[in-house]
Amino acid sequence: MKPILTLALLASLATAGETQLFNGKDLTGWQGDPKFWSVQDGALTGKSTAESPVPHNTFLIWKDGEPSDFTLTLKYKMTPGDDKKFTNSGIQYRSKFMEPAKFIVGGYQADFEYGDSYSGILYEEKGRGILAQRGKQVVIKQGDDPSRPKLEVTGETGDSAEIQAGIKKDDWNEYKIVAEGNNVKQYINGKLTIDVTDETTEAPKSGVIAFQMHAGPPMKVQFKDIVLTTK
């Protein structure tokens, strides 16, 4: 009975297209600036110091696909490198290479930080900026200027302060991103942070997955248990 159950489970996982994006040991399958990215304590780790600051936003990029419709789950943890406690990062998805030699990408970003303002929002790196604040359901409409779309708030996904209160500092949190058609949803620790439908011609349909190291004060950000399930 056990072999049959195991085979059935493997078949269901194969059908769902579940892929572990990180082997827990090294940077196989990923590309980024080795000055900042490594594996520490079984996690993908981006680290900057006062002596070695990040000059511009740089990214660790998954090399093995540009998924369209998917669910991505992972755990992340942040540690400020000084008493300023400024630590900002994000998960890029449906993104594109902007400056490959500098490991710079642009596109949708599931934002998070050590502070209380930006975790859970939808930001578009190298693009249209903040597209949805935490706790909002938004429809993005075409504007006269493609870089300045009309953001129509159509509802709430929850209370922003309550969502923030459930995010742990100096510990692991779980992020989930669900992208299907022109709709994207983001969750932190099981709470829906944004629900966005992008009706513009600029809406990305597919693209790379990447993790951000933000320019600025010293910081450390870590990622593990990274699972991509494609439709």
Question: Which ranges hold each PLM region?
Answer:
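Sec-dependent N-terminal signal peptides
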Residues: 3-13
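Carbohydrate-interacting regions of secretory-pathway proteins
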Residues: 16-231
